[in-house]
């Protein structure tokens, strides 16, 4: 007979563990089924390890530029194995902390690969036959790297994001297929550690989801760093074994580059196959994502889905928010649906990119009478002091109305976006933000200056 809980959670990544922690904080008895250590892709193969290696790249870049500040440090060398060790120490510390937190809230963590055997009864079975059921079931099985037809990941020639995060020696030359957030982060990191990078994007510009002016600014910065970025590029062939010949066609014509590895970075697929969902009546779309309503509930009453298995932004903080909505819905509380077009995004390449809300193009497509302001970091005292004056803050607003979107490319953009997100989420007007005092000298002043510009009375 299956053990009974208030909520059974299948999957221990950000969506799953957030569901468990928030539910337990609300007094619910929770079972969490996870096949590996808790933490999921974000903690073990995504956000945390990637940003740890990007921080290594930043330190290397900073030391190389130390002479500009009058600091003689010589030419630095990189021990990537030591960097990987530090990365793993960060992961282990966070994982242990998460395990301790789950234990402290009395969440029952069950090790094993779970399968839904009866969605109506909210029952899950693991490989050793253990069964648990609940008054509600939350699906949070995550995602895996998506490959291209004929380009199966082999760990030597064709690499996924998982493989890239395990490099022990910097490759000499790579081609990266896909210039979205992850592709641009990899391009930036590898260029910093000495790799010759060719970045290929099939759509008309790199970072195709961001505002066009931000994309152009990042492409310009990449060119200055000798990252060979090609938008509108279609890969026509990949040949060879040890040395790979990558042929592609783009606006510049047909080109071939020789590389050591090809990194495929075109997104992630939901892990929904083979876990009993369709057999249980859980509705999936043609790409395998679970269909949910605004309260994260599936077609089966009492069964919810959160995180990467839902066709929403595949971001850990979005999974956290979805987990809260799911638990509030289970408790019968007022759970406001998430406004996905307003959530903040952070891309940790150099220079960093961050945004929240609508791009200028999206705002115009939705019929807004749009006004914009662009303020450059080159005029900001703090940006010049830290030696990173490249980039812009762009604000998209409705004429005589609220701020619709904030888009940043430049130093510490992933931290600066917090103020932009609050402005977008609270539908603040440029006039309201322009009355706020920004400390000087700070990078945040650039955002304040942009709001002043939208009032028609810029200060600088």
Predicted segments with their positions:
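Glycine-rich flavin
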Residues: 2-5, 21-28, 33-170, 198, ...
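Beta1/beta-strand and adjacent pyrophosphate-binding region of the FAD-binding site
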Residues: 2-13, 172-180
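Short hydrophobic core segments
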Residues: 8-10, 114, 132-142, 177, ...
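Flexible, glycine-rich terminal cap/loop adjacent to redox cofactors
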Residues: 10-15, 19-36, 48, 52-59, ...
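N-terminal Rossmann-fold NAD(P) dinucleotide-binding loop
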Residues: 16, 183-184
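Gly/Ala-rich phosphate-binding loop of Rossmann-like dinucleotide-binding domains
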Residues: 20, 24, 187, 191-192
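A structured beta-alpha segment of the ubiquitous adenosine-cofactor-binding alpha/beta core
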Residues: 127-130, 235, 248-256, 268
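FAD-site-proximal beta/loop scaffold in flavoenzymes
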Residues: 154-170, 256-332
């Amino acid at each position: 007979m299956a053990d009974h809980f208030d909520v059974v959670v299948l999957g221990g990544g950000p969506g799953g563990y957030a569901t468990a922690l928030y539910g337990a904080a609300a007094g619910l008895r929770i079972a969490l089924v996870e096949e590996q250590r808790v933490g999921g892709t974000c903690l073990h193969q995504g956000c945390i390890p990637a940003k740890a290696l990007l921080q290594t790249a930043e330190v290397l870049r900073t030391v190389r530029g130390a002479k500009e500040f009058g600091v003689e440090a010589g030419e630095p060398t990189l021990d990537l194995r030591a960097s990987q060790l530090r990365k793993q120490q960060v992961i282990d510390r966070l994982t242990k902390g998460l395990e301790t937190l789950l234990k402290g809230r009395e969440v029952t963590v069950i090790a094993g690969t779970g399968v839904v055997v009866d969605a109506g009864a909210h029952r899950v079975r693991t490989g050793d036959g253990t069964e648990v059921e609940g008054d509600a079931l939350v699906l949070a099985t995550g995602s895996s790297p998506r490959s291209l037809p004929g380009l199966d990941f082999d760990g030597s020639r064709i690499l996924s994001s998982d493989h890239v995060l395990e490099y022990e020696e910097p490759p000499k030359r790579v081609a990266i297929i896909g210039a979205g957030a992850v592709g641009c982060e990899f391009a930036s990191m590898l260029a910093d550690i000495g790799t010759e990078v060719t970045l290929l994007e099939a759509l008309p510009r790199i970072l195709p989801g961001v505002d066009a002016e931000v994309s152009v600014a990042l492409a310009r910065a990449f060119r200055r760093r000798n990252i060979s970025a090609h938008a509108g590029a279609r890969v026509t062939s990949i040949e060879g074994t040890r040395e790979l010949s990558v042929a592609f066609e783009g606006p510049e014509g047909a080109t071939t580059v020789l590389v050591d590895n090809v990194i495929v970075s075109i997104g992630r697929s939901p892990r929904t196959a083979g876990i009993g969902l369709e057999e249980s009546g859980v509705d999936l779309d043609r790409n395998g994502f679970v269909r949910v309503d605004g309260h994260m509930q599936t077609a089966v009453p009492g069964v919810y889905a959160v995180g990467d298995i839902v066709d929403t932004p595949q971001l850990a903080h979005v999974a956290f928010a979805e987990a809260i909505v799911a638990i509030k819905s289970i408790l019968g509380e007022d759970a406001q649906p998430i406004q996905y077009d307003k959530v903040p995004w952070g891309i940790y390449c150099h220079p960093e990119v961050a945004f929240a809300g609508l791009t200028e193009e999206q705002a115009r497509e939705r019929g807004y009478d749009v006004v914009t302001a662009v303020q450059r970091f080159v005029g900001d005292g703090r940006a010049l002091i830290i030696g990173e004056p490249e980039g812009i803050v762009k604000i998209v607003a409705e004429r005589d109305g609220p701020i619709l979107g904030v888009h940043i490319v430049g130093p510490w953009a992933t931290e600066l976006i917090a103020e932009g997100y609050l402005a977008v989420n609270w539908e603040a007007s440029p006039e309201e933000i322009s009355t706020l005092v920004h400390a000087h000298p700070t990078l945040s002043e650039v955002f304040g200056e942009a709001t002043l510009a939208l009032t028609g009375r810029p200060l600088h």
